[in-house]
Each structure stands twice: as structure tokens, then as C-alpha cells.
Amino acid sequence: LVSSEMCIRDSNYIMKNFNLWLGIGGSLLITLPVQAQKKTKEKQPNVIFIIADDLGYGDMSCYGAHRIQTPHVDALANSGIRFTDAHAVASTSTPSRYSLFTGHYAWRRNDTGVARGDAGMVIRTEQTTIADMFKSAGYTTGAIGKWHLGLGDKTGTQNWNKKVSPGPEDLGFDYSCLMAATGDRVPCVWMENQQVLDYDPSAPIEVSYTQPFPGEPTGKNNPELLTNLKPSPNHGHNQAIVNGISRIGYMKGGGKALWKDENIADTIIAKSVGFIERNSDKPFFLYVGTNDVHV
């Protein structure tokens, strides 16, 4: 997912227009062009921001890794800037994304820890986000992949069978196609523009992080149904079963909308490419949260 005009091409351009923070090991931070409000004749660069959880400094071959080769990341490093002194603002999903989008330290608030799958949206709608700032500079904005910042007003009150608000559109994103939380947490459906993608009305969705649903199998009680991964009780991965894998949290319904774990990466790529192609004639900012690599 590389734009021909990515802003990391020229170090002089970056030093003039950007303050850049980059954290390796699960979180990256970037601020906007400080000259975003100025109208210039120069075409604005497209910005694609890719974040990977649990990706260590030594996991990519451009940093010296030998067991696994990462040629596409290496190509980005060779044509841009490879940082050798960088620090993560947080080592887990929710706080790193909170800081990425807001520019605020997550530890300044006590509700930015690793969020449940039914968490209310952690970022407040009155906060200014990186997407807001790009929009003010004339960009079309998108968020695709792992979200893990909550949706809706309050934890545990979402109606997953309707549009869930507030959400990314209230934080400056024109388009979104997201995993509400993580691959191992329910709900195991894609949320496109805050509505379940491929919603199946014959299988209404219910989610709970406190009580199992009567009659619904769990990894703890029905290990014989686990065809892909065995439960891990120490981490709570013994609750709802989706696609032969027991998850954190309880869920019923979903039907045709339930994702297939083996297709998650392909879905993220397809949705990202679609966004890029639809907006190829105008400047865009795209956040891409990968699911692969995440433990």
C-alpha cells in the first residue's frame, strides 16, 4: 500500500513540513504538516500510515532480521527514512492508537487501557484528531483494519444490529472498515462506516463481556468444537466460539457477517486498495491497522 507520492520520499520536505514521531513495537505517532493551512501550488502528498501490533525492532530484515525477510518494508526503508532511535508511547493496542490519533499521552487518562470489544469510544468527540487536521487541509480520510478504540457512547450498550455511534466519522474519518476491537475479541464482524458489513438479519447480534448466552457453546465447555486453536484460559480465550476459535467475550448471532480469520489480511488489503483507487485524484490520508503479527 504505497502511494507514488508518499510524504516519506524526501528528507528535506519532511524536515520542512512535518514533525514525526515513530514508535516501533506496536505504536507509531505522526503529526500533521505544520503548513497545512497554507494554500500552495505544490500537490499535497498522499499519506498512508500502517501500524502493526507486537512488531519488534528486530523483526524486519531492514533492521537486520534473518529468519524472516520483509522485502516490501525494506523497499519503503530504502526509498524513505529508516529510524534507528525511536520510542513507543505505549506497548499495547488501545493506548498506542489513542496517542496516535490525538497526540496526547494515554497515561494522562485512566480509561485508555486495553479496551473490551464492547467498549464505548475512548476518544471523545470534542477532541481534535489527526483525521480532523488532515480534513482541514483538504484531505479525504480513511481508517481500515484493527480499531480497538471502542464504538458507541457507553461500554456494553451498543446495538450491533444498527449503526453504532459515535464512531470514526465523529473523529474526522470519511470512510472506515474496521474490526471493532481485536481478532481474539468479539464481536467478530467487520464494521463498515459503523454498521455491520454484510449484516445478516436472520442472525441478530448480541455481545456480552459479563455473562454467556444460554445455549451458546464456549471454548471452556465445548473444547471439541475448537477446530483451529485450543483455548487459553489464562488469557480468557475460552469464551464464545467463532470460526472454530474461542474468543474473549460472549457473542451470539452474526450469521453470514462473521469473519473468517484466514481472510482478515486479504480484507484489509482489498478495502485499503479500494479506498486508494477511489481517491486517486485527490489527496488522502489512510490509517491501516494490520491484524497479522499480533500475538
Language model features with spans:
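Short, small-residue-biased leader/transition segments that mark boundaries at the very start
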Residues: 1-8
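Formylglycine-dependent sulfatase
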Residues: 16-19, 24-28, 34-295
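Short, low-complexity, intrinsically disordered N-terminal modules
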Residues: 11, 32-33
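N-terminal secretory signal peptides that target proteins for export/translocation
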Residues: 9-17
